[in-house]
Amino acid sequence: MVQIIARRVTASIEGDFVVFLIGMRINKPWKPHKWLPVFMAMPKMIRELERRPESGFLGHIAAPGLLVQYWRSFEHLEAYARDPDQSHWPAWTDFNKRLGKSRGDVGIWHETYRVRAGEYECVYSGMPLYGLARASSMVEAVGQLESARGRLNAG
């Protein structure tokens, strides 16, 4: 069973970091041969990254149609994405070959955000270890850290 943290907490992370949002959209569900390989590729990549702390991958949250990833730097993210010996690059080239001219069958997207040290805030209450707090360190949201403004000013 997941442990719920009943008190208010926030995340604490040293230095800059990257938030990477990635997802897919099945536009033609009757064509699983187009979208199923895309769907199946991500869990393998996550397992691979979790086994390699030196990759710079800090953690992730999964939701339907969306995966939020936390990275130490953009350079770490890019190095993983372009490494032909890791799972992403072969999956990406296979995706492009498989789709060919039928790009509308399945959609993929991503957004990358560089976050400067101290330029973030978050709070969790009545939650399991989650989000940035799960990918970094969790601290009590007390004193200056009780409000969003206080958390941002504390950075």
Q: What function would you assign to each model-found segment?
A:
Residues 1-63, 79, 103-155:
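Short S/T/G/P-rich N-terminal loop/turn motif that feeds into the first structured element of a domain
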Residues 74-107:
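An amphipathic, aromatic/His-enriched active-site/gating alpha helix that lines ligand/cofactor pockets
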